[in-house]
């Protein structure tokens, strides 16, 4: 009787363990920027595959990085780092190498956005969306053709009128470009020069903001300044007078990537979800809802001719040539941060 009872217990434990493993294997855990993965996309994946998508959100690369750095066994399968953080995470062995043979939709990606310095062979990253930083003007107040360069923001008639992004790297990149330097410059003298240049922009600066810059432009609390192409693309529905300009000196291209964590607990599901996100019809849906250009050429082909001709959705090769990919500047980051603090307090 004892043996019989013992066998029942063992059988139950085996069944319970198998059930638990099955339940855990039928999910993929995603850690993504706030409002950056449409709910209907996750729902469609679950409907097609039976794999549930658990979504957690973060508001900055720093938050995501710190959480993964604190515990490599935190349970996330997929993260969405921006290009410059992807490089840092790759170098610190925080990511799983990607087997492209498991991604049948990889060939749809735009070659112009592949093989960049932050991940030379895309062994650790898949482009998700591309963000470009440029100049925003309201054509009711300012002729768009009169503001074609970053340097134009220093005009005297823009005194106390600019919206400047509350983003250290973006703002220093703007100044470095006006001086003819790389946005990833690590020369302390050049960084100081950029800081001094930005100090002269303070009289023209009305507000530093990155959180609700769309609302500020739509409500016309600022009619000229910096902005991201995707945000302005969506804002034009509420205020069609908003125009986005790709500055002549160049601009920042930030690629938000899909990456697999080093200890992804549901590796095969991660591959399935990433491949699903690269499917042209899904990539199109994401781009239209989020507002940023898709790196997926198959998705662009599915869009209307009007959207294909829209440089906010589909910047051409000539435009992209002027862009620079944001990379990690870890070795001089404290210097950038010190000058940024001084700039924000107006000294």
Question: Where do the language-model regions lie?
Answer:
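Paired acidic/hydrophobic, glycine-rich loop segments that form the ligand-binding mouth/hinge
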Residues: 76-80, 206-207, 223-228, 243-244
């Amino acid at each position: 009787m004892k043996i019989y009872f013992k066998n029942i217990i063992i059988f139950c434990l085996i069944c319970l363990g198998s059930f638990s493993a099955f339940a855990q294997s039928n999910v993929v855990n995603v850690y993504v920027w706030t409002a950056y993965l449409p709910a209907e996309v996750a729902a469609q994946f679950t409907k097609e595959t039976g794999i549930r998508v658990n979504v957690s959100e973060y508001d900055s690369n720093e938050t995501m990085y710190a959480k993964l750095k604190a515990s490599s066994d935190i349970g996330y399968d997929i993260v969405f780092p921006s290009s410059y953080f992807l490089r840092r995470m790759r170098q610190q062995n925080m990511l799983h190498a990607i087997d492209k043979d498991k991604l049948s939709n990889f060939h749809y990606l735009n070659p112009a956005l592949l093989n960049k310095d932050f991940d030379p062979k895309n062994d650790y990253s898949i482009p998700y969306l591309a963000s470009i930083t440029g100049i925003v003007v309201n054509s009711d107040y300012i002729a768009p053709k009169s503001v074609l360069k970053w340097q134009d923001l220093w005009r005297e008639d823009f005194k106390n009128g600019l919206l400047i992004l509350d983003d250290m790297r973006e703002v220093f990149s703007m100044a470095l470009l006006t001086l003819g330097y790389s946005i990833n410059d690590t020369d302390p003298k050049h960084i100081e020069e950029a800081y001094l240049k930005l100090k002269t922009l303070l009289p023209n600066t009305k507000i530093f903001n990155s959180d609700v810059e769309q609302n500020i432009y739509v409500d016309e609390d600022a009619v000229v300044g910096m902005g991201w192409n995707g945000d302005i693309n969506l804002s034009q529905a509420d205020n069609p007078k908003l125009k986005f300009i790709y500055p002549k000196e160049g601009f920042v291209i930030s690629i938000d990537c899909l990456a697999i964590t080093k200890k992804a607990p549901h590796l095969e599901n991660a591959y399935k979800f990433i491949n699903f996100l690269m499917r042209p019809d899904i990539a199109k849906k994401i781009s239209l809802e989020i507002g940023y250009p898709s790196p997926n050429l198959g998705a662009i082909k599915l869009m209307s001719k009007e959207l294909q001709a829209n440089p906010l959705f589909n910047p051409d090769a000539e435009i992209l040539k002027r862009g620079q990919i944001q990379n990690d500047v870890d070795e001089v980051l404290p210097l950038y941060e010190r000058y940024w603090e001084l700039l924000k307090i107006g000294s």
